[in-house]
A protein has these predicted regions:
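Catalytic core of non-heme Fe(II) oxygenases with the double-stranded beta-helix
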Residues: 64-166
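Non-heme Fe(II)/2-oxoglutarate
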Residues: 1-72
Length: 166
C-alpha cells in the first residue's frame, strides 16, 4: 500500500467538523508540546479525550473504508485535528515510527495549503493534494510529506493505524 485517495460522505464530514468545533472551545484538548504544525493548533490524541467521545463511531467508519481498500484489519494508534491559520504549514516528516498507515481528511476547502508528497530525495514532489472538503488520502506511513502554507483557514483530521498484531 503506497497511496490512495477517496471521498468521504458530506454528512460524515459535517458531523466530524461539528464535533471538533464544539470540542475546540476547551483548551485542555490541545497539546502544549512541540509539533510539526507551524502557524496553527493541534489537538492531543482525541481517542483519549472526553470531549471527542462522540467522534468514535465516525472515525470507525473511516477505519472501515481504509480496511476495505487495503484488505487488512487495522487498529487505531492516534487521531488529531489540526487547524492552520493563514500562513500555517507543516514541516517535512513521516510517521514510520508510529504506524503503518497514515490518513488526512480535509474538513474544509481552503486556498493554498496543499499536501506535498516527496520522493526519497525529500525535494521532488510525486504528488500534490489540494485541500478539498471531504477528500481523504491515506498512505504508507514512511512516505515523506508536508503541508505548504495555507492562504486561508485550513482544518484537517489526521490519524494513524496499524495491524493489531504489530
Amino acid at each position: 500500500m503506497k497511496f490512495a485517495e477517496t471521498r468521504i460522505a458530506n454528512r460524515l464530514v459535517k458531523d466530524i467538523g461539528r464535533i471538533y468545533d464544539k470540542a475546540k472551545r476547551n483548551p485542555i484538548n490541545f497539546t502544549d508540546r512541540e509539533t510539526a504544525t507551524i502557524g496553527g493548533t493541534q489537538t492531543d490524541n482525541v481517542l483519549f479525550l472526553e470531549d471527542f467521545r462522540d467522534l468514535i463511531p465516525h472515525i470507525n467508519v473511516i477505519k472501515g473504508l481504509i480496511e476495505g481498500e487495503i484488505g487488512t484489519e487495522l487498529a487505531w494508534q492516534w487521531v488529531h485535528f489540526v487547524e492552520y491559520d493563514k500562513g500555517g504549514h507543516q514541516e517535512l516528516h513521516n510517521h514510520q515510527d508510529c504506524e503503518e498507515i497514515s490518513f488526512i481528511l480535509y474538513l474544509n476547502d481552503c486556498k493554498g495549503g496543499m499536501t506535498a508528497f516527496t520522493y526519497a530525495d525529500k525535494v521532488t514532489h510525486w504528488k500534490e493534494v489540494p485541500p478539498k472538503r471531504g477528500r481523504m488520502v491515506f498512505f504508507s506511513s514512511g512516505i515523506n510529506h508536508y503541508a505548504l502554507p495555507a492562504l486561508s483557514k485550513k482544518k484537517i483530521m489526521v490519524g494513524g493505524l496499524k495491524r493489531p498484531e504489530l
